[in-house]
């Protein structure tokens, strides 16, 4: 799986409680998603424990867990990303990242 992370990673002592991190996502400067890790269906400890049954996790491994409430498909009308959109996302204590949506050639 390819995904962006960073511009840095934080250690557990820098982050604090992983089950209490405010998350947000803006599209073109407009807030589309907000949430907190405390509302995750499965908690961080449960996810790490479950994955450890099937694989050996190593320091520095990143476990993508999904997205906060407010996905575009759930809006009325739906709000889908399009080429040229700028997506900025972040989390308290984690920093933020910014990406521009580009067209993908049809295959």
Task: Pin down the residues of each PLM region.
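Catalytic-pocket segment enriched in acidic/His residues
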Residues: 1-107
